[in-house]
Swiss-Prot record:
The chain crosses the membrane at residues 11-31, 40-60, 80-100, 125-145, 158-178, 187-207, 217-237, 249-269. Belongs to the ZIP transporter (TC 2.A.5) family. ZupT subfamily. Keywords: Cell inner membrane, Cell membrane, Ion transport, Iron, Membrane, Metal-binding, Transmembrane, Transmembrane helix, Transport, Zinc, Zinc transport. Fe(2+) binds at residues 136, 139, 165, 168, 197. It is a multi-pass membrane protein. NCBIfam families: PRK04201.1. InterPro entries: ZIP, Zn_transptr_ZupT. The gene is zupT. This is Zinc transporter ZupT. One of its GO terms (cellular component) is plasma membrane. Mediates zinc uptake. May also transport other divalent cations. GO terms for molecular function: metal ion binding; zinc ion transmembrane transporter activity. Zn(2+) binds at residues 139, 164, 168. It comes from Stenotrophomonas maltophilia (strain K279a).
Length: 269
């Protein structure tokens, strides 16, 4: 079993908490501004998507393969790493099937804005909060274990997830605020959803701490890579395209990949 220094655990948990708290930033944008700039939102979503795809395929998947190679040998390690990646995709597909993540638009012409029924908005708020909270658990695991094993990978990943969490905070705060007309409730709902990330990280570490090995890290990193790539392709990039007026999606995607590439190079020096 691998021995993890306690200070590394606290650092990883703090990084995960910081990424999760970005949902609160999203709620503040709703409560203290007239309306988020859709083109800037499109760029930010695509930036996060590009960053997550790049770090998942260039670093996290490779760490899965390397961990399996240390446990079982190079050839078997590559096979297991690939299987773990595909397993991660399957896991998040199942989660997305049973608990769909609402892709709420911020357009004031949407039914949620036109609907006069307070009860309808309350249902929208509840379903949105539950769905996004459920999706935040695997993101918390991803940030925590990536930082635990390699801060040079975990920190950029946490940054990408934090950007991704800002529009999620918006998606929660909008229906809650319109349903309750209470800024505190809207802020609290977004904040609690983001706290699901460090909670998921703590639960994951508690369950796996007694069996941490090269093979365990191999499975965790492979699953994380699959989950992150699916989230980027299924949620972030389509949402960015919906809000874009021009080439913001492409520019954001390239900027996200480029920023992560440069940051990973700098972390190596």
């Amino acid at each position: 079993m691998l021995q993890i220094p306690p200070e590394n655990v606290w650092i990883a948990l703090a990084v995960t908490l910081a990424a999760g708290l970005a949902t609160a930033i999203g709620s503040l944008l709703v409560l203290f501004s007239r309306r988020p700039n859709p083109r800037l939102l499109a760029f930010g979503l695509a930036f996060a998507g590009g960053a997550m795809v790049y770090v998942s395929l260039s670093e996290i998947l490779n760490k899965s393969i390397a961990s399996f190679a240390l446990a079982y040998g190079e050839r078997t390690g590559f096979t297991y790493g690939t299987l773990a990646f595909l397993a991660g995709v399957i896991v998040i597909v199942l989660i997305d099937h049973f608990i769909p993540n609402p892709h709420d638009s911020l357009d004031k012409q949407d039914p949620a804005f036109r609907e006069n029924s307070r009860e309808y908005l309350k249902r929208v708020a509840l379903l949105t909060s539950v769905a996004i909270t459920a999706h935040n658990f695997p993101e918390g695991l991803a940030t925590f274990f990536a930082t635990l094993e390699s801060p040079s990978v975990g920190m950029p990943l946490a940054f990408a997830i934090a950007i991704h969490n800002i529009p999620e905070g918006i998606a929660i705060a909008v229906p809650v605020y319109f349903a309750t007309q209470n800024k505190f409730y809207a802020f609290s709902a977004s904040l609690l959803s983001g706290l699901a990330e460090p909670v998921g990280a703590a639960l994951g570490y508690w369950l796996l701490s007694g069996s941490l090995s090269h093979a365990t890290f191999g499975w965790v990193f492979g699953l994380i890579a699959g989950v992150m790539v699916f989230l980027a392709l299924d949620e972030l990039l389509p949402a960015a395209k919906r809000y874009a007026k021009g080439h913001e999606t492409v520019y954001g995607l390239v900027a996200g990949m480029g920023t992560l590439a440069i940051s990973l190079v700098l972390f190596k020096w």
